[in-house]
Amino acid sequence: MVPEDDQNLTDDPSKLGHNVVSLFDQTQTRYSPKAAIVCGEHTLTYGALASDSDRLACLLLSRGISRGHVVALALDRTPDLIMFILGVLKAGATYVPVDPALPPERVNQMLDDEALRLVIVSPVSTKGGAGTGRYDYGNKAVCCTTSELQDQMRYQADKRPAVDIQPDDIAYILYTSGSTGKPKGVEIHHAAICNYALSVHQRPGCTDQDRVLFKSTISFDMAAFEIYVPLLCGATVVQAQAHDIRDPRALMHLIDRHSVTFSVATPTILQMMLDSGWCGTPGFSKLVTGGEALSPRLAERLTACVEEVWNLYGPTETTASVAAWKVQVGEDILIGTPNPNTRLYVLDADLQPVPVGSTGELYISGAGVARGYRNNPERTKAAFLPDPFWEGHTMYKSGDLACFLDSRRLAVIGRADTQIKIRGQRIDPGDVEASITAHADIANAVVVNRDERLVAYCIRKPGVGSAEVPLAKLLRPWLEDRLPGYMVPSFFVEVDRFPSTLNGKVDLRALPDPISTITPAKIPASTLTQQLLAIWTDVLGHGQIGMQDSFFHIGGNSASIIQIQTKLEKLLGRPVPVPKLYEHFTIANLAAYLSDQTQTNEVTEETKNPAGNDTTGEDIAVISMACRLPGDIHTPEELWKALISGTDAVTRVPEERWDADAIYDPDPEARGKSYSTGGGFVRDAMDFDAQFFGISPREARAIDPAQTMILETCWEGFERAGYGTKSLRGSQTGVFIGTGNSSVDDGQLSAAGTEKFEGHLGLGTAPSSLSGRVAYALGLEGPTMTLDAGCAASLVATHVACSALRQGECDMAVAGGVTFLPSPGLHIEFSRIRVASPDGRSRPFSADAAGMGLGEGASAVVLKRLSDAQRDNDHIHAIIRGSAVNHGGRGASMTAPSGPGQKRVVRAALAAARLKPYDIDYVEAHGTGTRLGDPVEASALAEVFSSSRDDITGPLRIGSSKSNIAHTQAAAGLAGLIKVALAMQHTMLPQTLHSSQPSPLIDWVGGKLQLLQRPMAWLPRTNDPTAPRRAGINSFGLSGTNAHAIIEEPPRAHSNANGADDDDNDDNARLPLPLPFLLSAYTSEALRQQAQKLCNHLSSATAQTKLSDVSYSLATTRTHFPRRIILAAQDKTELMGRLASIIDNGVPATADNNKTARVAMLFSGQGTERARMGKGLAERHLVFRNTVSHIAELFESVLEKPLLDVMWAEPESEAASLLRRTDYAQPAIFTLQVALWRLWQSWGVQPAVVLGHSVGEIAAAHVAGIMNLADACRLVAARGKLMHALPESGSMVALEAGVDEVTSAIEQLSARDRVSIASINTPTQVVASGEMDVIDKLAAYFEAQNRSSKILKTSRAFHSHHLDESMLALLRAVAETIVFQEQTLPIVSTVTGKLAEPGQLSSADYWVRQARNPVLFAEGMQTLADQGANCFVELGPASTLCGMGASCLDGDLSQTSKVAGREGAKNLVWLHSLNPKSDDALVIHNSLSDLHIRKVEIDWAAFFKDIGGRRIQLPTYAFQRHRYWLDGLRPIYSDKSSGQPSGQSPSGCPQPTGQIQVGWHTIDASSQYSNSTWGLLCPASDAPWMSPVKEALLHAGKQPVTVNQLAEAKAMSGVLCFWESDSEDDMISKASEQLQTVSRMKFSPWVVWVTRGAVGAGNMGEASLWGVMRSARVKYPQLCLRIVDLEGDVNIATATKLCSILMMSTEPECVVLGERVLVPRMQFQMQAQVQEVQKHSKLCVNGQETTNGATAAADPNGTDSFENKIRMAGPEERAMMLQGLVRGITAKALGVATAEEVDMHQGFMDVGVGSLGAIQMRKELSAQTGVKLPANLTRVYPDPISLSDALQKQVEGQ
């Protein structure tokens, strides 16, 4: 690398000649009132920091300290730490940071170098702080404590010290490890610090808006970044305290609490934070790492957490760092750009530059280089050399081996010496070795790094007295008194001699494994110690562990201690603080500590909290609420409206339930009668949207409405919280549902004739299914349980859910309760015991209370740990502070309320909430309205709360929602909680109805209680206005269970449901660009109603709503269902108009597009470029802007003018004219395309295949992973320069003609040597390139035939003979330096027009041919279509390729397609990224919306990062409910003979119109030759079909080797497993065993299962293997698994196809059928119009009638059998008959009324065909058709149309 190259052009005089003090003075003058340092609860402003440090400096000067003197700082991490540093510097002195924890010997070595004048120490801590440590500093100099100096500072005048500080003055001296056993003091001067800080301000960039974390010790060079970078630019330093340093979670809390935006850390610390669960923080935008190598894996994880990640490089001797590299995912991590005034050289032993690509030693020169080593001229002379390339400068010999990969990229590849870096600390092995050999018993020592652990190999002196003492016991204390802790080896290994190499040096690789030398003591066999041993073994990587071994002495360190913490917390289910792990560092101590903690917890629960309630856990946030209650209440908002308006929701018993008059009797003793005629009923309780949850009508009829009510309510709860199926499925979300009395009445079931529901009724009515059905339907994997606690059930469920969250059993939970009243059983029972209300109304605490009114309903809340909810920005409705559950014990009777029990449960809840009775404002009482229960409850409340009430606090207010909605039993407790949360939100307490006269049985005055007889404002407490509102909720069960919960008002910042900004709340402000408003549903009608609900919401919103919040929430918090629309609008008026159009006119047809897009990305070539292309995108999207800037920097060295100055120049300007030059145009096109791809990629859009036109193919190759970005840029630059250098006598013309016509014309003009075909763009458009005069003649030739031609605006002939061999050689030279990488995406080559084979584009020769040969774009488009591409996204400045591509694929191509999904050009989609006639962002946003409509998964959260928006509450899904429950059921207890109960029959269910489905499609599987070895795992070596398989493998270049077990094939390309078994169970067992073996072995070659007849004809055993394999590929994604089915006899042709399939790694499932290879493809089919088929009915096909069902089955071999009729029918008639049969039998399995309700294209699983239905269908279809079908019928054929197609092929003998 030539030292004068562009890499080293870093001169910047503005950053030179400064000192720290003067720069700080400038900063503090500007930012005096701003916070400079935040430490714990202390904040120091810039003004205060300047004033205090001035006083300290003046004090030091008065004590004789002056310029050039040295002051040692041995300080703890107190808030004044930085002030003391600045004070020393302002006095002109130099400071030496001393870690107070260092051993005395080390401190002595450091301070011996110095002529110390003063040592400043922290006062000795009484709490175990470092204080003055173990060293007597008074032996070296005058010693003062910080407190002494601060006392004296008070008497100093407030003035600036008059000291003339020079840039060359030494600011501080840092000591690092030395090779002789003595540390080296590195002298860093002021100018170096200032140049460094000013450089970082520029790159990576630090501003006065940043808050920078300071966590390093000041003796570590990274502290220079954390202190000086922020303080010299006006930023705020957030200083971590000592207890924060070791605990990553404490650091994470610190970052969150103080809104840190910027931090620097070693990779080790960052790994520890990630392992502790850190995933970034809002506002934390920049992360800098250094001190050790940053791995690509860690870099990738970090870039997912932070907007920018930078890697810094630089030794301590060069002031922290000398270069910065911005980390990009997928790119190498290099040294980066040198700092200003810094140069980097890679030199050989003669100090001469080495060539690019060669290795040398890295030397660093410039303003940051230290002055040398303190008082060590020999070492200084060896390491700090005069710079021969830069006069007057010194260069530092770094010891790092480095290599310039090209002129701008520099990488470190190793060390030239033995220096070691472990967890960011630099260690010279000689330093440690010298300290070891200083021991009298040690003759020699070698120290090495093994797996990030220091190992010392030692030879003892013979005959020493310590021979029996273990080496570690002898040396560890010795070294701990002499070396820092990080330099003490983890392992000490005693050897007799050191192994040597041939040249006599120690052979480090031959030294023994240190683990093998450890002899651990036996671990006792207790469960806990064995569990600890397993965890330590896993983390340390070895099992040589004894009970008393220190974790840190057997390989543990600060990074691995975090892994221990994580695993322990998972094991124990409770927090384990990191400091405790440092304190208890042996298995014995740790086991004792953990056991004590467990016992302490148990004792506390038994003695202090007998109710067993959590008193120490984290608060729980209620992040969503949902309900379905009497009075047509479907939302919490409707509940609040009913409560505040005083609505009475009680009605007479609906006739569809039972005849209240028929069972009425005023006598409570009348058997089978009830005196109660009313209650709280949910009008539509029996209605349900079964299709939404994938439940068939047949199953839905057998499901208790309690299950369907709670299922829909839980869904709405999650949806209101902003969580859809994508985030819920597979999550650790718990489900806790409360229930009470069974909904199901045996009499009703018997009357309904339930035999037709057998198989569904058990689950449909089981209480356990209440929770299980919710978890199953939503895919939740946390703890799931149904709790029966009577009327207390939902509050008990909430209590259990909170406990599960606190114990870490789940991350989120839904708690709910539900009751359904289908029969009068409870009315009769409660009438007999005289607690039922005659009219169904509850009158809580009223003088005329007459019993409870029974009701029904569902309520649910979604819960999270409060910290998690705040982290995730969830909307918090309320905070559950604590809860408790108990039982009243043995009282007067089981049903009598227990006053003592109620008091105990309230007090336990208060204890759990860490609150006192006076903290509670209101109690939502159980309040059923019984004459016994209400006084008992009031008395219990009075005893708990009355003593805490006074004239200031006022009485405790109580009320009950049962007065409005009756007693909803299992749902009641949560209904009360929801009421209280709403009351907190509205700061209003609703009245309790029917309570004009409070009960005289209650002492209201003495008990200091107040019944809310009217609505009352909930005002802040007089004695504490800042206290949040708090309330308790009572809920008691009839069997004696008591529950109480205490909830608290959330902070307003987390409870603002509106989400509107305070400074921008105009909900009809016009936006700069239209925003997308996403709506979706399962059906078109649901989608229309969804639009109606949104329209109503926006119209009736009481608070103004920002459109950006609406758009964001619709996109990111809603599940996106199959039918989709996107409405684009810029203001509310426009959005409302578009919604009205949907409401009035219905959903457009595009919403029903059920075809999933297969995306191909097209990268355009030169000629499409234009001025300002992409500039509009850069202004709006950060990813695009950063990518463009980054790539433009890579082109800087090869272009005369900065690329962006040309790309984004004003049109017609001089700079813009440069775009007409190829050397600018091609880099510009490439830059734009890669930035567009990164933008698409950031939004989650991934292409299935890519294609590039001309230079666009380089961008496509980069996207496909074939070359990295830097290499691609070099290739583009070379190509552009080459083509710009072409003769200007060339020309190009676009002709309206086919390639044969143009070729013929060239021949006729005798111009074959002067003109070439440059591009075949479409079948009828060809571009010719060549000599200008010939091009003109060619144009005239076609114009004479009335064919259009267009001379292109270029004076050069691209892709022609003008590119001669000499010019192409230049391109080849560059291409040969490219390091090609493994292809990650399919790419179509425009050199061949075909799909590129692996490695085809990975050669210089290819790219030379690509520049010269014609562009076969038209053929490439055909290949894309053959690959199933149906959605084409162009990445370029215009829509050129889309237009040409549409011409290529014009017409219906489905006849010739080889791949599924092609339905002709009319179904293809062409999308643009940019369009010159439209706003840049608008074009790409519209295209993104189109992809969403076509089911492409979009990361909408990423899209809105640049737009903004907050999560707000929006309307939930528009359920399409229908009546199912026991269809045909009549009310019992009825004297009336009227028939059907009201409601729709299932035949009113919506009819789906289409669905994505799987079909088998032929692909091209041409035989390919490749050298490889394949193992054959065969059932029998003499199987008749083995011979052709082996022969075909040999012909294809694949060596077959018979193996007996998988292990023999580990080194082969793969193994073919052939299956044959007579037993299905035996086959599945063996298959599962094999998969487990493959997983356990981490088997990397391909495992290909070969079955025979598993698909189609239905070999039952082998068909089952397909299901096993499909499950395995999901379960073991890391394995290479495939399956192939061979139909019919295996011959050489079949075997050859099998060999071809082995080369097609992208097809996991294939079927060989004769000469064809079939693969499954997703496709969309329109619904077939066939006649209804039902069993025992007639099938009408083309006017003919044939019997079906039982009649046909009676004579299966007769001429009238259905089987014979379909075999005799023609193809079209047969297809109709089979479709009708499948449709009818599917209708029967589903239980729908007519076959017309079956959508032939909707998946069996989607509509609810379960395993029972599939078995019945297979049985009936086989009986009707004579076709043997596979056992896994509905998996092989996922929908009716694919099943009927398969039947037809089987019948036709295919």
From Swiss-Prot:
Active site positions, chain numbering: C791 (for beta-ketoacyl synthase activity), H926 (for beta-ketoacyl synthase activity), H967 (for beta-ketoacyl synthase activity)
Keywords: Ligase, Methyltransferase, Multifunctional enzyme, Phosphopantetheine, Phosphoprotein, Transferase
Ranges where the record places region Malonyl-CoA:ACP transacylase (MAT) domain: 1162-1496
Pathway(s) per entry: Secondary metabolite biosynthesis
Enzyme Commission (EC) number: 2.3.1.-
Residue ranges of every copy of the Ketosynthase family 3 (KS3) domain listed in the record: 617-1049
Top-level lineage group: Eukaryota
An example Gene Ontology molecular-function term: fatty acid synthase activity
Cited CDD domains: A_NRPS, PKS
Transferase listed as a keyword: yes
Protein purpose: PKS-NRPS hybrid synthetase; part of the gene cluster that mediates the biosynthesis of pyrophen and campyrone B, which represent a class of fungal amino acid-derived alpha-pyrone natural products. The first step of pyrophen biosynthesis is catalyzed by the PKS-NRPS hybrid synthetase ATPKS that uptakes and condensates L-phenylalanine and malonyl-CoA in order to produce desmethyldesacetylpyrophen.
UniProt protein name: PKS-NRPS hybrid synthetase ATPKS
Gene from which the chain derives: ATPKS
